[in-house]
């Protein structure tokens, strides 16, 4: 779906926000997995540079992660609801100075006002960014404090964990390899073959990835494979649900 207004000219961030708004209209239908829609949109808009793509994608995902809080805050203000959600999401991946320069004065005034809201005063279910029903079930199982902590973890962008393929390399060797590359890494706390990378480095472009020496796998899944204790001739299938 496309919004009626034309793409703004000039300011790159303003164009990113326009693209994020177009994309969000489709994503909020929730009839296709969000990551697929984002990937398709970025493929169709090759004029967007790497930084632009990052802003568009992260703005949309920020809205999805914090949709209930953002929707609460976006009850006020002018323009469309999707526009207000995009402005809130953009604050998660842009600077205030850059955002202020890219949007209208009244939009910045609104952003500044809602930013003063203490979200800790909102109802617990709203703060969790979950439905009332789901939050009630978590609260019944774990108590409100732990339910909120779990919800916060679920709504936080996952770190990038990799698993070393011991047939082709070792964790020590991979650590040395990353010492020569622009990667900030740390040993996974529990998984014996895991490393955790900070940020979202372009692993696909590295020789160590294309050679099969490492694979992307979260630490929890790595631990499950060890707990299963697969023997020679057995296989563990790790089905990834992704954003679906």
Q: Residue ranges of each PLM-predicted region?
A:
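Glycine-centered loop/turn positions within well-structured domains
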Residues: 160, 222, 234
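Conserved hydrophobic/aromatic pocket- or pore-lining residues that grip, position, or stack substrates
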Residues: 138, 162, 216, 224, ...
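Glycine-rich SAM-binding Motif I of class I
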Residues: 244
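Conserved class I S-adenosyl-L-methionine
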Residues: 233-240
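Short, glycine-/Ser/Thr-/acidic-enriched flexible segments
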Residues: 202, 221-222
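Class I Rossmann-like S-adenosyl-L-methionine
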Residues: 1-205
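Glycine-rich helix-loop-beta junction characteristic of Rossmann-like nucleotide cofactor-binding loops
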Residues: 206-207, 226-232
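Class I SAM-dependent methyltransferase Rossmann-like catalytic core
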Residues: 208-214
């Amino acid at each position: 779906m496309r919004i009626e207004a034309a793409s703004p000219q000039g300011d790159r961030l303003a164009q990113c926000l326009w693209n994020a708004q177009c994309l969000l209209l489709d994503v909020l239908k929730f009839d296709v997995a969000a990551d697929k829609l984002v990937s398709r949109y970025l493929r169709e808009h090759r004029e967007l540079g790497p930084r632009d793509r990052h802003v568009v994608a992260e703005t949309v995902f920020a809205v999805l992660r914090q949709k209930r809080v953002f929707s609460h805050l976006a009850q006020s203000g002018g323009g469309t609801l999707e526009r207000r959600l995009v402005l809130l999401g953009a604050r998660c991946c842009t600077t205030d100075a850059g955002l202020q320069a890219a949007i209208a004065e009244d939009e910045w005034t609104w952003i500044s006002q809602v930013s003063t809201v203490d979200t800790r005063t909102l109802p617990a279910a709203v703060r969790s960014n979950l439905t009332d029903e789901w939050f009630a079930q978590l609260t019944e199982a774990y108590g409100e404090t732990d339910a909120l902590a779990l919800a916060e973890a679920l709504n936080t962008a996952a770190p990038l964990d990799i698993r070393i393929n011991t047939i082709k390399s070792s964790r020590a060797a991979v650590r040395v390899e990353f010492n020569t590359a622009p990667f900030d890494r740390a040993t996974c706390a529990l998984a014996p073959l895991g490393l955790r990378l900070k940020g979202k480095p372009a692993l696909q472009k590295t020789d160590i990835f294309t050679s099969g020496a490492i694979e992307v796998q979260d630490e929890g899944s790595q631990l499950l494979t060890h707990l299963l204790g697969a023997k020679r001739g057995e296989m563990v299938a790790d089905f990834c649900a992704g954003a679906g």
